[in-house]
Amino acid sequence: MKTRITELLNIDYPIFQGGMAWVADGDLAGAVSKAGGLGIIGGGNAPKEVVKANIDKIKSLTDKPFGVNIMLLSPFVEDIVDLVIEEEVKVVTTGAGNPSKYMERFHEAGITVIPVVPSVALAKRMEKIGADAVIAEGMEAGGHIGKLTTMTLVRQVAAAVSIPVIAAGGIADGEGAAAGFMLGAEAVQVGTRFVVAKESNAHPNYKAKILKARDIDTTISAQHFGHAVRAIKNQLTRDFEKAEKDAFKQENPDLEIFEQMGAGALAKAVVHGDVDGGSVMAGQIAGLVSKEETAEEILKDLYYGAAKKIQEEASRWAGVVRND
């Protein structure tokens, strides 16, 4: 099956692995790209040396295309932009900011630019400044989120722009991927399920929290004060909840406390395994993720599962024709 995304990026499967900070390193992204998807390194707030090491790792594993996710509010953003150009990275996804400042340089270097968008307005703006595609990510996703669900966002973005759309947020199996394609997406991005891939270096405690999660086990923190984040409930999310309640009672709340509480929280969970005091970012679909598999097994399950579901539904609807 071919889409504009598989053709544009020269990948076998129309499936992206989300560029999750601290999780999406060279081992994971390399395994995904090697297996035919698009592996994406999570740049996060990492310095140039760390991202370079991950790029080197991928290149040692495969010669297939891969991407780097650049957080545009990172203090090292200029260095990372220079790096991806120097290293001839084929794809850049962006978040937390406007990539227009770098668009010309990216395109001159032959880099495909795919921003993550939480709204139709931002998708249109990205198309206008020259984005090659957009990732429409719904609030079901883990980590930093917007306000629209995947079903409402993807369909409206696909109807509003002419560039390809990648659906993200709440997708972890073939049925979910099929839904994304039916909404008009030409690829899907998956995060939470890849966190527990066998090639993922996320701490075993972090993986265990996802594997044990139920459908109701994630919550949103700091949605009224700061940047909303979805994570699995733990002591940190309860502390955030209390801080928000206290802030509502104050005429001029100190919002700095939310930045302090969140600083280093993801690394604490992913790297050090503190899944009570750290931030266990995961999507609402975590309740459907029940086992560790290789990146290749995950890709094939998503791809062939989507094909099976679409074919089943097509056969059900065969012969239905509007005659009026």
Residue ranges and their predicted role:
Residues 151-162, 166, 172-324:
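Conserved active-site-proximal phosphate/metal-binding subdomains
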Residues 1-160, 164:
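Active-site entrance/lid segments in N-terminal catalytic domains of soluble metabolic enzymes
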Residues 116, 169-170:
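Conserved acidic functional residues
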Residues 20, 170-171:
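Active-site metal-binding loops of divalent metal-dependent hydrolases
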